[in-house]
């Protein structure tokens, strides 16, 4: 007696019920698999994104906000910090590399980041990987031009403050022309989604998010001079400009810092300028906590470890993942109950068939196995379809995810937990079929073979 042929026949006889219950199992498994893939993929990408960012320094506020703004081009900047602090860090013997960033504009939603050529020449966004050009060159940078831009921005700020107080304003002298002031190097995703090409000009809008009310800097168009190769990090979704050009445009006037430094940190030299944040790479990890404490003891700046902040973030959102996973398990449980009810309801129609099998020599254990195997088969097929479906859904969504975030989730990677999900489906099928199987086991042969009156 071939049990699988009998099980297949029974499933075909109840095709609609089998399809509905199997689909319920598939949906539950697909949801669970998709949640696991997305969680692991997003967490892995976020953690990889911090590899080149050993320490981030910015204005006092939320460390997580600072990390999201600097490393991932998300959220808004907590504020500005002193350029003198950057110079101090750059000259610190414990610091291997210091890279300044200034933000405040966007082009079609892509963050515009003011920085120096150090970002392209020395910065590694991952160990051993620097931003590489697919076309063109990097922008020209000269520190003298940056200091001139700082002075110009400070003069504009003083003029604005004088106007606000109703004082007579003496126009500042026209700044000296700067060679190649408005050059930009764009990430691969920016080039792909905006259609910008090498040598093309574009006009930025004020603010880090696109808005219909945002003022466009029509007087200062930037020229694309370079396009970066894909990195599958936030670098792909950014536009990098010369830091001095950032302060040449209106709306980026230099104002007084929001918090003064400690008295012992003050000197008679005026602060030449400000930046949004500084990324620091240390000569050795042993210097990390010492410098971290020094920066956080200041009243005008704070330091954050991106890797630690991202771990905290996923500790928080992990509760949401567990809730979604619990919902997926609940769907599986409901599907299991539906399987049990479906088979149980069909037992009244199948009692005579079972009695005939018994009369032909089938043992009680064989009948029990047939019903139990039917429930397990429905769950296994549904779970297998759900497993494949979960991966297909994530793979199909990767196109949208890449456009929105610049990275993709490895949809073909099978996690260990997925095999546990399949095991749970088998156990669930066995439990679902246990009640109907016991009913079949106890079927009275004589009564069910007797002719109905």
Segments predicted by a language model, with ranges:
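Short, strongly hydrophobic transmembrane alpha-helices
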Residues: 17-41
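Mechanotransmission and gating elements of multispan inner-membrane complexes involved in transport
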Residues: 92, 212-321
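Internal alpha-helical transmembrane segments of multipass membrane proteins
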Residues: 23, 321-342
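Short helix-to-coil transition segments within interhelical loops
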Residues: 11, 358-365, 443, 452-453
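Hydrophobic secondary-structure segments that place a key small or acidic residue at a functional site
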Residues: 106-116, 126-257
């Amino acid at each position: 007696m071939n049990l699988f042929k009998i099980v297949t026949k029974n499933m075909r006889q109840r095709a609609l019920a089998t399809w509905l219950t199997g689909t319920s199992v598939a949906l539950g498994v697909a949801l669970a698999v998709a949640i696991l893939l997305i969680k692991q993929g997003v967490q892995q990408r976020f953690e990889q994104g911090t590899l080149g960012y050993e320490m981030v320094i910015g204005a006092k506020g939320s460390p997580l906000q600072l990390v999201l703004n600097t490393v991932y081009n998300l959220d808004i900047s907590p504020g500005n910090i002193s350029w003198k602090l950057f110079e101090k860090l750059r000259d610190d013997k414990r610091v291997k590399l210091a890279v300044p960033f200034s933000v405040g504009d966007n082009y079609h939603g892509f963050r515009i980041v003011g920085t120096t050529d150090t970002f392209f020449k020395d910065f590694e966004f991952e160990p051993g990987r620097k931003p590489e050009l697919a076309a063109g060159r990097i922008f020209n940078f000269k520190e003298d031009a940056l200091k001139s831009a700082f002075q110009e921005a400070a003069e504009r700020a003083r003029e604005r403050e004088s106007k606000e107080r109703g004082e007579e304003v003496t126009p500042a002298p026209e700044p000296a022309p700067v060679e190649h002031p408005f050059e930009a190097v764009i990430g691969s995703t920016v080039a792909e989604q905006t259609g910008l090409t090498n040598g093309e000009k574009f006009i930025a809008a004020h603010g880090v998010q696109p808005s219909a009310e945002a003022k466009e800097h029509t007087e200062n168009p930037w020229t694309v001079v370079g396009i970066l190769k894909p990195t599958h990090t936030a670098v792909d979704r950014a536009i990098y400009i010369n830091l001095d050009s950032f302060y040449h445009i209106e709306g980026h006037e230099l104002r007084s810092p929001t918090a003064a430094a400690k008295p012992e940190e003050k000197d008679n030299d005026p602060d030449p300028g400000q930046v949004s944040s500084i990324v620091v790479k240390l000569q050795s990890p042993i210097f990390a906590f010492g410098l971290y404490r020094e920066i956080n003891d200041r009243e005008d700046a704070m330091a954050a470890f991106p890797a630690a902040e991202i771990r905290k973030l996923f500790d928080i959102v992990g509760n949401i993942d567990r809730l979604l996973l619990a919902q997926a398990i609940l769907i599986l449980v409901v599907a299991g109950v539906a399987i049990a009810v479906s088979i149980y309801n069909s037992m009244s129609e199948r009692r005579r068939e079972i009695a005939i099998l018994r009369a032909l020599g089938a043992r009680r254990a064989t009948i029990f196995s047939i019903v139990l195997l039917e429930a397990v088969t429905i769950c296994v097929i549904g779970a297998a379809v759900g497993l494949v479906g979960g991966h297909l859904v994530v793979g199909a969504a990767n196109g949208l995810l890449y456009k929105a975030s610049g990275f993709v989730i490895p949809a073909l990677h099978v996690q260990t937990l997925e095999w546990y999900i399949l095991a749970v489906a088998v156990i669930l099928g066995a439990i679902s079929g246990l009640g109907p199987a016991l009913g079949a086991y106890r079927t009275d042969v004589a009564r069910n073979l007797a002719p109905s009156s």
